[in-house]
A protein has these predicted regions:
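Conserved N-terminal subdomain of the carbohydrate kinase-like
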Residues: 2-85, 113
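Anion (oxyanion) recognition and catalysis
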Residues: 19, 98, 102-106, 136
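Glycine-rich beta-alpha junction loops
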Residues: 32, 57, 117-119, 148, ...
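Flexible, glycine/proline-enriched loop segments at strand-loop-helix junctions
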Residues: 54-57, 82-92, 117-122, 167-171
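Charged helix-capping and loop-helix junction motifs
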Residues: 67, 94-99, 125-133
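Short beta-strands and strand-loop turn motifs
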Residues: 79-85, 110-119, 146, 195-197
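Conserved phosphate/ATP/ADP-binding segment of small-molecule kinases
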Residues: 107, 121-218
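Conserved post-catalytic alpha-helical subdomain immediately downstream of the catalytic base
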Residues: 204, 220-276
Length: 276
């Protein structure tokens, strides 16, 4: 896990929590004066959740190229995953992302990107499309929801309309999802795997999930999860990404098994409080 944190007791408590979950933290660097925060008002029934970000001037928001020794970090690595949030906080942060991507590319790592578009974070004078389109060109694997692909790559969503596990609309829309994947690969020629995380929010606590993968000219899809009593959806996308990367590494010849594993991880996260 690589980030930049202020050198204080709160940051060290965060690092200890990451270590307790089995994450390596040797790539974390210290600098800056404050830890970025967000405040979440949880939704219920027909009331949506609301988030307030307090990240301006944080240690990560003031990250610049040259602050992280990427060559040392990548020396024994095979995969580099990054999030669009890292590029959303500042131009300097976006430049640091490009630095990391260029080095990872030069060193032969597999590169994956979670588009992670957060409208409230893009406040430094550039649009997400302007910044992210050049950066995603380094991607072998791309993750995202349909609105994120639309915001960054300009691809019109298909729409996920399923309301329960028996809904046949998902099956009828699969040819359109295949065309969606083809368009992503046209816009990002390096990309070998396009993942779409699909969610239909019936209410704030009732969500229907599925996922599709477009790769090697074919579309694979999961079944549908109908989560009627959701506990906390925050982090469910990260759980999908983490599960998918694990699945691709563990089951290199079985993308469908990896896809099912990833969606199961995401569905399970909806039943657990907390962001990770």
């Amino acid at each position: 896990f690589v980030t930049r944190l202020p050198d204080n007791a709160v940051s060290r408590a965060c690092i200890n929590s990451l270590r307790a979950s089995g994450l390596g933290t040797d790539g974390i660097v210290f600098g800056g004066k404050r830890l970025g925060l967000y405040y979440l008002e949880c939704g219920a029934a027909f009331r949506n959740s609301n988030v307030v970000y307090d990240r301006e001037g944080s240690s990560f928001a003031t990250l610049r190229p040259g602050m992280i020794d990427w060559e040392t970090i990548f020396a024994d690595a095979g995969w580099f995953h990054w999030s669009g949030i890292a590029a959303a906080l500042s131009q300097e942060g976006a430049d640091a992302c490009r630095e990391a991507l260029e080095i990872a590319d030069r060193m032969g790592l597999t590169i994956s990107c979670d588009l992670n578009f957060r409208k409230k974070l893009w406040n430094y004078g550039c649009t997400a499309a302007e910044v992210m389109q050049p950066l995603v060109q380094y991607s072998d694997v791309i993750f995202g929801a349909e609105p994120e692909y639309q915001e960054i790559l300009g691809i019109q969503p298909v729409g996920f309309r399923a309301v329960d596990t028996a809904d046949v609309s998902f099956e009828s829309d699969l040819p359109s999802f295949e065309k969606f994947g083809q368009e992503v690969e046209r816009l990002v020629p390096r990309c070998q795997k396009v993942f779409l995380e699909l969610r239909n929010s019936i209410t704030s606590n009732h969500n229907v999930l599925a996922a599709v993968l477009y790769s090697d000219g074919t579309l694979k899809h999961t079944g549908i999860y109908d989560i009627e009593h959701e506990t906390d959806r925050v982090g469910a996308g990260d759980a999908f990404v983490g599960g998918m990367i694990y699945g691709l590494i563990t089951y290199p010849d079985d993308d469908r098994k990896a896809l099912d594993f990833a969606l199961a991880a995401s569905a399970l996260k909806n039943t657990v409080y907390g962001d990770f």
